[in-house]
């Protein structure tokens, strides 16, 4: 029996194979196009964990829906299932065993989607839109962490309608990440808080933001022992900060770099600066991808402090990205991110999710 029971696809499921895509300015990198992409802006992407055989991709959109595809080794994508919220879906994540997907929405709720039964139930409630959602698997507890614009961080046992714990945030939650035993939350007004999750979640440290502009995305990275050791933080000002929690030499080890900017130098020619919409670390190499409102993705080696690759420019922003569990596939979503306001929104423009073979391009150059 398949994970999703009988065929429960959505839309018209055409196929899209490696190497068979047509190229134009919506897909200048000749990457694989995911079939039946959402009908409105795509806000979040997440691949299934390694506990699940195969690769499944989840996307949440401003059409209030969450979609799931199976990604086959050939590159073919098969629509599997779909669930709805009553507001835009801002974040998605998986349970560690791959049996559940958790979704956060502007409708002020979070849901748990059981992929075997294809049933979704509400598991969380906030007083404002829920911006982030993460599954926490600790030795002594499991829970879902939700961050909201109501300035709270809540932790939920999925069997109870009341939160296990509520932590107050200094401002609205804008982005967050979790790799046990660490969580990091970035808020409005450039707030930045690290939490430790052992035994029970608690605030570990508040950090003065290394960035001067609004926080947009954050991703935790690991050290060589596979332990979370720091995070990358992106802002609307085309800049990423690499920040270690306990570095031997903070002034030397922590740094920021510019990205997602046009080629002007700011002195002789004005430079266009774009938001960093997403950051994802490669699960094997520890290198990272950034995507931006400029319609490009870039790959970086933070240890060598070098850029590995920048894509050609797509004809609309790249709103989200993620790697699959072994780092062979890089997924990125091309859709309007509202960075230029409603007057630049074109409802006729299609939204796309692309898949790229990432096995070689993310390797650090100094590795033999």
UniProtKB/Swiss-Prot annotation:
The modification Phosphothreonine is found at residue 229. It is found in: Cytoplasm; Nucleus; Cytoplasm, Cytoskeleton, Spindle pole. WD repeats lie at residues 37-79, 84-114, 125-157, 168-206, 215-255, 271-301, 310-346. One of its GO terms (molecular function) is RNA binding. Residues 15-34 are annotated as: Disordered. InterPro entries: G-protein_beta_WD-40_rep, WD40/YVTN_repeat-like_dom_sf, WD40_repeat_CS, WD40_repeat_dom_sf, WD40_rpt. GO terms for biological process: cell division; nucleocytoplasmic transport; regulation of mitotic spindle organization. Keywords: Cell cycle, Cell division, Cytoplasm, Cytoskeleton, Mitosis, Nucleus, Phosphoprotein, Repeat, Transport, WD repeat. GO terms for cellular component: cytoplasm; fibrillar center; mitotic spindle pole; nuclear envelope; nuclear pore; nucleoplasm. Gene3D superfamilies: YVTN repeat-like/Quinoprotein amine dehydrogenase (2.130.10.10). Plays a role in mitotic bipolar spindle formation. Binds mRNA. May function in nucleocytoplasmic transport and in directly or indirectly attaching cytoplasmic mRNPs to the cytoskeleton. Interacts with NUMA1 (via N-terminal end of the coiled-coil domain); this interaction promotes spindle formation in mitosis. Interacts with NUP98. Interacts with MYCBP2. Interacts with USP11. Belongs to the WD repeat rae1 family. This is mRNA export factor. It comes from Mus musculus.
């Amino acid at each position: 029996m398949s994970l999703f029971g009988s065929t429960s696809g959505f839309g018209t499921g055409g196929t899209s194979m490696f190497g068979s895509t047509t190229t134009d300015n919506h897909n200048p990198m000749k990457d694989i196009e995911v079939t039946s992409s959402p009908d409105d802006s795509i806000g979040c992407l997440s691949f299934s964990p390694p506990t699940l055989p195969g690769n499944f991709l989840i996307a949440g959109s401003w059409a209030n829906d969450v979609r799931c595809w199976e990604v086959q080794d050939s590159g073919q994508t098969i629509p599997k299932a779909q669930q709805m919220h009553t507001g835009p879906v801002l974040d998605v994540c998986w349970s560690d065993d791959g049996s559940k997907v958790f979704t956060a929405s502007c409708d002020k709720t979070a849901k748990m989607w059981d992929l075997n039964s294809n049933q979704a139930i509400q598991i969380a409630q906030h007083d404002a839109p829920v911006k982030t959602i993460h599954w926490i698997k600790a030795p002594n507890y499991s829970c879902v962490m939700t961050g909201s614009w109501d300035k709270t961080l809540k932790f939920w046992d999925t069997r109870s309608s009341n939160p296990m714990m509520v932590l107050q945030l200094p401002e609205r939650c804008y982005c967050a990440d979790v790799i046990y035993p660490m969580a990091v939350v970035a808020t409005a007004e450039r707030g930045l808080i690290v939490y430790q999750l052992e035994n029970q979640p608690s605030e570990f440290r508040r950090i003065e933001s290394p960035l001067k502009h609004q926080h947009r995305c954050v991703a935790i990275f690991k050290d060589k022992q596979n332990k979370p050791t720091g995070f990358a933080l992106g802002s609307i000002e085309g800049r990423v900060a690499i920040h270690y929690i306990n570095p031997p030499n903070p002034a030397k080890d922590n740094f920021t770099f510019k990205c997602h900017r046009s080629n002007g130098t700011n002195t002789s020619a004005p430079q266009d600066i774009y938001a960093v919409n997403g950051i994802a670390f490669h699960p094997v190499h520890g290198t990272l991808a950034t995507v931006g409102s400029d319609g490009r993705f870039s790959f970086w080696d933070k240890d060598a402090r070098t850029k590995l690759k920048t894509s050609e420019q797509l004809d609309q922003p790249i709103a989200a990205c993620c790697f699959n569990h072994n780092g062979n596939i890089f997924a990125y979503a091309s859709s309007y991110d509202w960075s230029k306001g409603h007057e630049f929104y074109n409802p006729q423009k299609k939204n796309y999710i692309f898949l790229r073979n990432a096995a070689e391009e993310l390797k650090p150059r100094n590795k033999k």
